[in-house]
C-alpha cells in the first residue's frame, strides 16, 4: 500500500494560530496546545477589559471634572454641576467636560457660571 501524504489544512490552521501568538513568550508561542489555551485566555481578557476600560475612563473623567469644579467654588460639587447641566439642557458629555477642565479651565469656569446663573 502506498503512503498518502497528509493535506495542508491542519498545518495552515496551526500556522495561523502561531501567527496570533508570535508575540507571546516561551512555550506560549511554540507549543500548539498552550498557544490555543493562551489565545482563548487573551481573547477573553480583551473582551472583559474593553468594558473595564470604559468604566475606568468614565471614573477618570468624573474625577477630573470634580477636581476642576471644586477649585471654582467650595460649596459646588460634581453632582450638582451635572444636575444643573441637564437642567440647562447643555449637551456636553463627561469626556468633553474633562478635556475642557484640563486644557482650558477658564472655559469651564464660564460654563459653570452660566449653569449657576440658569438655576
UniProtKB/Swiss-Prot annotation:
Nucleotide-binding among keywords: no
Gene3D superfamilies: 6.10.160.10, Ribosomal protein L20
Protein's job: Binds directly to 23S ribosomal RNA and is necessary for the in vitro assembly process of the 50S ribosomal subunit. It is not involved in the protein synthesizing functions of that subunit.
Protein name: Large ribosomal subunit protein bL20c
An MF annotation (GO) of this entry: structural constituent of ribosome
Protein family: Belongs to the bacterial ribosomal protein bL20 family.
Pfam families for the chain: Ribosomal_L20
Subcellular location: Plastid, Chloroplast
UniProt source species: Nandina domestica
GO biological process, one term: translation
GO CC list: chloroplast; ribonucleoprotein complex; ribosome
InterPro entries, sorted: Ribosomal_bL20 (IPR005813), RIBOSOMAL_L20_CS (IPR049946), Ribosomal_protein_bL20_C (IPR035566)
Top-level taxon of the source organism: Eukaryota
Keyword Chloroplast tagged: yes
SUPFAM superfamilies noted in UniProt: Ribosomal protein L20 (SSF74731)
Record's keyword terms, sorted: Chloroplast, Plastid, Ribonucleoprotein, Ribosomal protein, RNA-binding, rRNA-binding
